[in-house]
């Protein structure tokens, strides 16, 4: 998988996560599916099927890989997501949109069927969409080949109930073409209506609805062909359901679907044949049906009469049926078969559905998953109907395999398995997961008896045994053992409920996850021997019947059992058969309670003590263990039976198998005793040897504890040690009392030896590690002993190489060592050994990126502990380019435990920074005084680090992370950085590199608006002045640019984004702008690009917001510099140049004489032409405003302008421009604008709403120019009469606004004034008579205008036009 870059998670399953990935050095994207290795068989099955498929509507499979903890599938990446998400967003789709989906689905299904593959899991979440909206079928984990179905039709009863066909709930029902087509009908129905056709929150109600209720009609105006298609797909009888030939030729399809050759379905044909035989037997209490039914009878209300716990195709039609008036035959008045099936009614053939049995099987399989983590842990809602399954969502998948008892190795015992349970919560059908798969791969089960030699694989079989051959249609006994709610055990340090609303305060608040205390049965499951039951000489009720019998009813049976067990007349064979029968009873919780708390258990204890036959003692010990395992309550009376002594003696037996099963049974009993939690407020005894008396009848001596612990000594049988390890693991999960009793030096040494032993199976080593974790958790001083026996380097090495479960154990041990570091005499000696494990960092990064939620969270905590204990680790993690992006992506995860770990991690790392900055500051001060030199020791060196300045880049990297930035930047940190900016003004070894990093850090901070606004006072008073000092005399261009950019970013945010600036901050801002920035401006403007552009923009902003006065600017002789850009290449000009010149030209403090001396009017006109030619819209208004400012200055002194000038045109009035003009204040080269009057008129003609402001300024410039340079302006104006016509004509085209009218009035005034000047100065110009006539016509119309003032001006202009020579 190191060929791929792994990005964010795009989908989640129960034991899988799908990531977006990219192949390295390419732009090819893939979906990389990571599956827990415990699902290896299922993954390989999916790979085999995907490898054989190649179709545009089937998800492409590229490769698969196996890593130490996961299986990886590299699949096609579909950007459109899945259909389920689409329906959640849009609720439902129109028929025309469904058509394309349906067409692709039919093509894809037909392709699969042509390859002999039944999909078995068609539902919206398995239908992906590509960028073009075409569908892709995915997830073939449940798919089956026709050949496999023919060989074993009864297996594979798994699926999503909402989309399963009715026949799949029936005895003998199998997957087929027909069941896939039913699912297709459900999907299309859901696309149109927004919900599946049959909906219920409880499994039993859902199955009844699917099997009995007619298909709900489609709402709205669905086409007849679409309605017919849905009805044909949702016919309940698979034999009558639409088939491929009819489906391909259906009227719904606009383009033809070609029918391909399909393989035969022998198993399906057999199922149909069986269901149509003339006589069937019904298994409902083993009562035969004499006649084959055709239809179900309706009662008087029209409802069908049926057993609550089973649904049948019909009742016998030749036998009078209860509830039928007069007992008449049922079929006479019923509708025809075709009529019912047309409406998706009931199946015609005789089929039986035992709903309660199916529900109980599904519930049992769900509980088995739960028990892997929650054995003997009370579960919520325990008083609800134990056979009912709540269906949380339409995508929930259930397992209906009754033989799923020992479906594979225990999650801790498989040589290749890893604990899928570690990434799950307490079986609450986690709604954050898209898939809720509760199935796992099956392995063949073999019957075994206790006197056969068990293999280590048998010891792994620790799931609940639910294979009893009972009729589940009877009243429901407990489907699997569930404890009564015991008094809550000690929960010190247990993070069970990860409430994301409560923020963690420290790492220890989120240290533990519920999976850290997962417990499992010690006793392996035993397969019931059905033959043994039949060979007994007395009646043997089924477990469900046994549990219903009263005490008096059971007494004769108990006496017979006791007689056989204790009587000398009974042969060994009969006793062994009886034991096998009792094993069958033990799998029922109610029956196990009766046997455990009754006389039979007392006899079993006695027989175990007295029997001399090893094989029989093995069976007795096994039976005792099974009874205790499955019992939910054990009375204290059993404590007086000597059961502990008997099992203890068995543990001392010389026969290996007796010791094995005695240990397993003793382990179950000790664990039960530990759950009675009477040591809630336990405090360790003064002496470890001091006995602690229990309030209950159970007394567990220290000698017994020592005996169990001694089993782990070197040389003992591996299986016996497995049972002892499970015992210790389970008991130590119950709190400090029990953990302290087991915390002996010898036990810890033995556990460490087993954990390190290379010859032991991985699962055994993991259990030993789990025991060490629990001992150290509830008895913290133990961790020091563990680390002395098991070095941190060895634990880290196991973490690198181990499976997911071992990695969780290693992380817990490492984290506890970090927490207890203060108890070690020299923890640094231990910690430095971790640096020798070169693969530690890559493994941690891989876990944080791709591991389960629990492992990710714990890995983050470990990184935090490492960095907290030694700052050397900071650079390893946070200066790595991959680490922080991975951490940032975790913020998108929904898992509450992971989010709390992430928050605690961020808080801890952020809390390290202030102390680190203080240390760096002290080191630099010592470097400056010569008391310390700069070289840095490497990470793996044992020598003390000479300086910490090399850690400073960590701050920069953290600021680039969205997770850390806001947590890190506090007033304290900012003041520390401000202090460092003062220090770097002086010289010291390594200063230049450190200074650039410091400036980059400040740049990151000042680029964030909230941080700047919250800390404006510190930035303005303490940081910005120091930056001005750093700029001065700095030879590094990058450093100089960063200084200015920090100024620019900070002030831009403060000036533009702060609604109100405090008065004191405003005064400070004004002060530093004039005292620090303005003196630098001449140097800034001469610096290398892009520094001048930033400096100009900042200066303009400060001038506009009145923080810098023009008078202050003038003192620094910067005027000529500001206008220099006009003399150079105009293409290099920026808008801030123009704005700055505009500010200067508009300021009253500016002397016109200075502007006149610059002689830049012609260059300003050239700039206007350049702006127009290049269509530079952002330059247009400032450039025109600059022209206007120069024109205004040319007309008189500054005071006169402000008091007498008005925007209303007065050129034709008697009193126009009556104020005095000071020749010294005029712009001498103002007449150069005369060549630009055509441009002014062009811009004045822009009359759309977005350009009216430009037209306003341009028309004003024309008015001012005619007065300032009358002759030149008149010449330009009259030679551009064609440009005047459209301006005046706009009066006709649009409704005039106030500003538009002002522009028209100005142009009319200019026209009249120019005519006057032409005549008065006897100018010789060639004027087009045609243009004059057109203008005259428009002006004549304006004389009749009702717009205010326009008609009077038009009259005056008309008179002047008449005077022009023709």
UniProtKB/Swiss-Prot annotation:
Acidic residues bias locations: 398-414
Induction record: Cell-cycle-regulated.
Xref: SMART domains: S_TKc (SM00220)
Composition bias type Basic and acidic residues, residue spans: 283-302, 367-376, 422-433
Keywords annotated in UniProt: ATP-binding, Cell cycle, Cell division, Cytoplasm, Cytoskeleton, Kinase, Microtubule, Nucleotide-binding, Repeat, Serine/threonine-protein kinase, Transferase
Catalysed reactions, semicolon-separated: L-seryl-[protein] + ATP = O-phospho-L-seryl-[protein] + ADP + H(+); L-threonyl-[protein] + ATP = O-phospho-L-threonyl-[protein] + ADP + H(+)
KO phenotype (gene knockout): Seedling lethal. Abnormal cell division with defective cytokinesis due to abnormal phragmoplast organization and arrested cell plate expansion, leading to enlarged cells and nuclei as well as incomplete cell walls. In metaphase and anaphase, enlarged cells with several mitotic spindles or a single greatly enlarged spindle. Impaired endosperm development with altered cellularisation. Cellularization defects caused by disorganized radial microtubules (MT) arrays in seedlings and adult tissues, as well as during male meiocyte development.
InterPro entries according to UniProt: ARM-like, ARM-type_fold, ARM_RUK, HEAT_ULK4_RUNKEL, Kinase-like_dom_sf, Prot_kinase_dom, RUK, Ser/Thr_kinase_AS
HEAT repeat residue numbers: 595-633, 638-675, 699-737, 835-872, 878-907, 908-945, 946-986, 992-1018, 1019-1057, 1072-1111, 1279-1316, 1329-1366
List of residues binding ATP: 10-18, 33
One cellular component term from this protein's GO annotations in UniProt: plasmodesma
Compositional bias of kind Polar residues: 304-313, 438-454
GO biological process: cellularization; cytokinesis by cell plate formation; endosperm cellularization; microsporogenesis; phragmoplast assembly; pollen development; radial microtubular system formation
UniProt subcellular location: Cytoplasm, Cytoskeleton, Phragmoplast; Cytoplasm, Cytoskeleton, Spindle
UniProt-listed Enzyme Commission number(s): 2.7.11.1
Region (Disordered): 276-356, 367-386, 398-502, 524-549
Function statement: Essential protein that regulates phragmoplast microtubule organization during cell plate expansion in cytokinesis during cell division, both somatic and syncytial. Required for endosperm cellularisation. In pollen development, involved in cellularisation during microsporogenesis by regulating radial microtubules (MT) organization in microspore mother cells. Seems to not have kinase activity.
Name listed for the protein in its UniProt record: Serine/threonine-protein kinase RUNKEL
Organism: Arabidopsis thaliana (Mouse-ear cress)
Gene: RUK
């Amino acid at each position: 998988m190191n060929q791929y870059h792994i990005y964010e998670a795009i989908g989640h399953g129960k034991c899988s996560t799908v990531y977006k990935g990219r192949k390295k050095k390419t732009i090819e994207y893939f979906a990389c599916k990571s599956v827990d290795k415990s699902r290896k068989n299922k993954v390989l099955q999916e790979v085999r099927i995907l490898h054989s498929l190649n179709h545009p509507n089937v998800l492409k499979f590229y490769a698969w890989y196996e890593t130490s903890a996961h299986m990886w599938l590299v699949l096609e990446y579909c950007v459109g997501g899945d259909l389920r998400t689409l329906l959640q967003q849009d609720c439902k789709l129109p028929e025309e949109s469904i058509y394309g989906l349906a067409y692709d689905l039919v093509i894809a299904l037909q392709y699969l069927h042509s390859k002999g593959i039944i999909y078995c899991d068609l539902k919206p979440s398995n239908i992906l969409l590509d960028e073009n909206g075409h569908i892709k079928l995915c997830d073939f984990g449940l798919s089956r080949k026709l050949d496999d179905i023919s060989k074993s039709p009864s297996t594979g009863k798994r699926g999503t109930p909402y989309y399963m066909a009715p026949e799949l709930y029936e005895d003998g029902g199998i997957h087929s073409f027909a069941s896939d087509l039913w699912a297709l009908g459900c999907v299309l129905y859901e696309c149109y209506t927004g919900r599946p056709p049959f909906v219920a929150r409880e499994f039993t109600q859902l199955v009844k609805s699917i099997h009995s209720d007619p298909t709900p009609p489609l709402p709205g105006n669905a086409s007849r062909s679409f309605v017919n298609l849905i009805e044909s797909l949702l016919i309940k009888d698979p034999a009558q359901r639409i088939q491929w030939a009819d489906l391909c030729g259906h009227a719904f399809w606009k383009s033809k679907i070609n029918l391909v050759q399909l393989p035969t379905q022998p198993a399906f044909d057999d199922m149909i044949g069986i269901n149509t035989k003339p006589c069937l037997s019904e298994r409902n209490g083993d009562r035969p049906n004499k006649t084959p039914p055709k239809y179900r009878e309706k009662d008087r209300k029209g409802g069908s009469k049926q057993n609550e716990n089973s649904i049948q195709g019909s009742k016998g039609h030749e036998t009078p049926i209860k509830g039928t008036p007069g007992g008449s035959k049922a079929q006479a008045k019923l509708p025809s078969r075709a009529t019912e099936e047309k409406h998706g009614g009931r199946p015609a053939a005789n089929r039986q559905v035992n709903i309660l049995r199916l529900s109980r099987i599904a519930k049992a399989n769900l509980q088995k998953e739960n028990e892997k983590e929650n054995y003997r842990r009370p579960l919520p809602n325990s008083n609800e109907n134990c056979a009912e399954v709540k269906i949380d969502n339409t995508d929930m998948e259930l397992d209906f395999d009754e033989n799923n008892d020992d479906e594979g190795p225990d999650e801790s015992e498989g040589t290749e398995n890893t604990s899928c349970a570690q990434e799950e919560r307490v079986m609450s059908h986690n709604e954050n997961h898209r898939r809720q798969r509760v199935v796992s791969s099956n392995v063949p089960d073999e019957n075994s008896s206790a006197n056969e030699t068990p293999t280590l694989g048998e010891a792994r079989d620790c799931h609940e045994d639910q294979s009893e051959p009972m009729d589940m249609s009877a009243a429901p006994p407990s489907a699997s053992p569930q404890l009564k709610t015991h008094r809550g055990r000690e929960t010190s340090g247990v993070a069970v409920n990860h409430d994301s609303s409560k923020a963690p305060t420290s790492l220890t608040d989120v240290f533990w996850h519920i999976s850290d205390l997962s417990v499992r049965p010690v006793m392996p499951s035993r397969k019931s021997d059905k033959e043994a039951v039949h060979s007994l000489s007395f009646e043997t009720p089924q477990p469900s019947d046994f549990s219903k019998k009263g005490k008096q009813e059971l007494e004769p049976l108990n006496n017979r059992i006791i007689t056989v067990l204790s009587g000398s007349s009974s042969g060994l064979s009969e006793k062994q058969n009886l034991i096998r029968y009792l094993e069958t009873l033990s799998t029922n919780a109610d029956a196990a309670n009766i046997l455990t708390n009754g006389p039979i258990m007392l006899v079993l204890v006695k027989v175990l003590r007295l029997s001399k036959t090893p094989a029989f003692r093995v069976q007795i010990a096994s039976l005792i263990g099974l009874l205790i395992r499955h019992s939910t309550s054990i009375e204290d009376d059993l404590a007086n039976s000597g059961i502990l002594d008997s099992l203890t003696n068995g543990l001392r037996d010389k026969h290996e198998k007796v010791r094995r099963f005695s240990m397993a049974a003793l382990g179950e009993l000790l664990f039960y005793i530990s759950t009675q939690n009477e040591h809630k407020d336990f405090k360790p005894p003064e002496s470890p040897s001091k006995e602690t008396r229990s309030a209950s009848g159970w007394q567990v001596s220290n000698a017994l504890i020592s005996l169990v612990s001694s089993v782990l000594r070197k040389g003992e049988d591996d299986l016996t040690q497995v049972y002892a390890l499970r015992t210790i693991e389970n008991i130590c999960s119950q709190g400090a009392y029990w953990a302290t009793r087991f915390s002996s030096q010898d036990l810890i040494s033995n556990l460490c030896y087993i954990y390190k032993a290379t010859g032991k199976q991985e699962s055994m080593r993991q259990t030993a590690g789990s025991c060490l974790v629990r001992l150290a958790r509830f008895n913290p001083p133990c961790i020091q002993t563990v680390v002395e026996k098991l070095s941190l380097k060895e634990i880290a090495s196991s973490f690198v190489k181990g499976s997911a479960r071992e990695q969780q154990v290693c992380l817990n041990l490492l984290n506890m060592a970090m927490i207890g570091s203060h108890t070690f005499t020299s923890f640094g000696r231990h910690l430095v050994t971790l640096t020798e494990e070169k693969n530690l960092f890559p493994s941690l990064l891989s876990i944080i990126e791709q591991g389960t939620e629990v492992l990710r969270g714990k890995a983050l905590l470990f990184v935090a502990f490492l960095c907290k204990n030694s700052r050397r680790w900071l650079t390893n993690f946070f200066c790595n380019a991959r680490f922080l992006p991975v951490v940032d992506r975790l913020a998108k995860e929904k898992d509450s435990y992971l989010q709390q770990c992430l928050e605690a991690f961020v808080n801890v790392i952020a809390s390290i920074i202030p102390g680190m900055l203080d240390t760096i500051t002290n080191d630099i001060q010592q470097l400056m005084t010569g008391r310390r030199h700069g070289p840095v020791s490497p990470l793996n060196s044992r020598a003390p680090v000479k300086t910490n300045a090399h850690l400073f880049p960590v701050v920069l990297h953290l600021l680039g992370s969205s997770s850390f930035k806001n947590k890190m930047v506090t007033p304290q940190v900012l003041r520390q950085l401000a202090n460092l900016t003062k220090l770097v003004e002086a010289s010291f070894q390594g200063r230049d590199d450190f200074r650039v990093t410091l400036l980059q850090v400040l740049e990151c901070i000042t680029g964030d608006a909230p941080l700047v606004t919250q800390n404006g006072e510190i930035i303005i008073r303490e940081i910005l002045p120091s930056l001005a000092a750093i700029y001065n005399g700095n030879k590094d261009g990058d450093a100089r640019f960063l200084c200015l950019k920090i100024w620019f970013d900070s002030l831009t945010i403060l000036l533009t984004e702060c609604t109100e600036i405090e008065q004191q901050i405003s005064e400070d801002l004004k002060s530093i702008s004039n005292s620090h920035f303005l003196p630098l401006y001449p140097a800034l403007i001469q610096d290398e690009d892009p520094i001048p552009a930033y400096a100009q923009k900042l200066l303009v902003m400060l001038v506009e917001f009145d923080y810098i006065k023009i008078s202050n600017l003038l003192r620094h002789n910067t005027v000529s510099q500001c206008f220099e850009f006009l003399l150079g290449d105009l293409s290099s000009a920026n808008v801030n140049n123009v704005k700055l010149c505009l500010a200067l030209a508009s300021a009253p403090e500016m002397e016109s004489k200075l502007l006149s001396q610059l002689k830049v009017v012609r260059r300003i006109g050239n700039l206007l032409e350049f702006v127009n030619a290049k269509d530079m819209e952002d330059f247009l208004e400032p450039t025109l405003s600059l022209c206007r400012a120069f024109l205004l200055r040319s007309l008189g002194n500054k005071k006169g302008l402000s008091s007498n000038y008005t925007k209303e045109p007065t050129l034709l009035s008697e009193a126009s421009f009556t104020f005095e003009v000071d020749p010294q204040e005029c712009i001498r080269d103002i007449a150069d604008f005369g060549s630009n009057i055509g441009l002014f008129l062009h811009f004045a003609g822009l009359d759309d709403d977005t350009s009216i402001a430009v037209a306003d300024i341009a028309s004003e410039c024309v008015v001012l120019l005619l007065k300032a340079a009358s002759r030149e302006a008149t010449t330009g104006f009259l030679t551009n009469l064609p440009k005047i016509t459209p301006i005046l004509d706009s009066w006709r085209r649009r409704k005039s606004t106030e500003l538009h009218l002002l522009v028209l009035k100005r142009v009319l005034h200019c026209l009249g004034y120019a005519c006057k000047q032409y005549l008065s100065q006897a100018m010789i110009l060639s004027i087009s008579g045609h243009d004059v006539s057109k203008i005259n016509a428009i002006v004549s119309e304006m004389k009749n205008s009702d717009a205010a003032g326009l008609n009077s001006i038009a009259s005056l202009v008309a008179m002047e036009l008449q005077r022009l020579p023709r």
